Amino acid sequence: MHQILRTSFVLAAFAAPLAAQTPNANCSGRSTATQDACEKATDLFSFIMPQLGTSLAGGSHTLGLGSTLGGLGHFAIAARINAIRGDVPALGSLNVGAQGRSSSNIETNSQFLGLPAVDFALGIFKGLPLGITRIGGVDLIGSASYMPEVATDDVTLTPADGGLKIGLGARVGLLEQSLLVPGVSFSYLVRDLPVTSLAASAGNADFAISDFSLKTTSWRLAAQKNLLLFQFAAGYGQDTYTSEAEIDIDITSPVPVSFATSVGQEMKRTTMYGSFGLNLLIAKIVAEVGQVSGGEVATYNAFAEAANKSRLYGSVGVRVSF
């Protein structure tokens, strides 16, 4: 996770608003010495941010759950690790020119990128009876994400307010799970990474990023069925990623120059997943796999894989519920 965070912050340091497969209009207004840095960073930022968004928001809202809990007195908590099969740009081999923009073939390294998380859900209303099931049940749902302070030889990452961020949302039961009926629900959740500042050096540039934020909103239509020792769940939904940052940058060579800018991106992606769980008394061990796809990202530079490539992700964890 540190690798993708570090990469995304480095890339954001040069970034400007995204253009569509042509030179970035906002970069065109810059000096010749900063045009190439602007174009490359815009593309790199746009390439990495969807992966970071998926590592935060991908998959089920509560690991292995597709039904409401059954009203007051019921709760669930799950500790999980999310991982996405991603591609990280190779910054060490990337050169920024000073003679105007130049389209490059940017190398990437394939690797799994992970983020730990804690999900929680609290029953609020058990719903209205309908035959052998109930409808209209309501749960409060949420998640907790934590970003530690990081200090290495070439990067210092400082999260604001202790680095802990709580996301909140709600789940509404369309059908409550019973002996014969699967549980079906709709949920909506807002999840953010903690606001972060970064100071770093990369290649021929030094930079400082302040007020970096990544906000996600997502909805899920999910179903769940327990069969003795086993549980099965599946879901479909959409994620929206919104990122912003303020940056200052000093290019040290071949022509020393400084500039400042704001950077931001918004993207919507479709997600679908399935999970399998093993019931062990009060604890459930759950494994989940899914795929995220869609969204539009245009780049001036070339990558081995498209920035909006469909990507596999997975989660594994333990859930306790009553």
Regions found by a protein language model. Name each.
Residues I81-R85, I124, A144-V150, L174, ...:
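Transmembrane beta-strands of outer-membrane beta-barrel pores
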Residues Q21-G163, L175:
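Transmembrane beta-barrel domains of Gram-negative outer membranes and organellar outer membranes
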Residues L179-K268, Y273:
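Detector for outer-membrane/organellar transmembrane beta-barrel domains
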Residues F276, K309-F322:
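Outer-membrane beta-barrel "beta-signal"
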Residues G127-L130, V138, Q177-V181, L229-F232, ...:
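Repeated loop/turn-to-beta-strand initiation elements of outer-membrane beta-barrel proteins
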Residues F75-A79, F120, L140-A144, A170, ...:
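Membrane-embedded beta-strand positions of outer-membrane beta-barrel proteins
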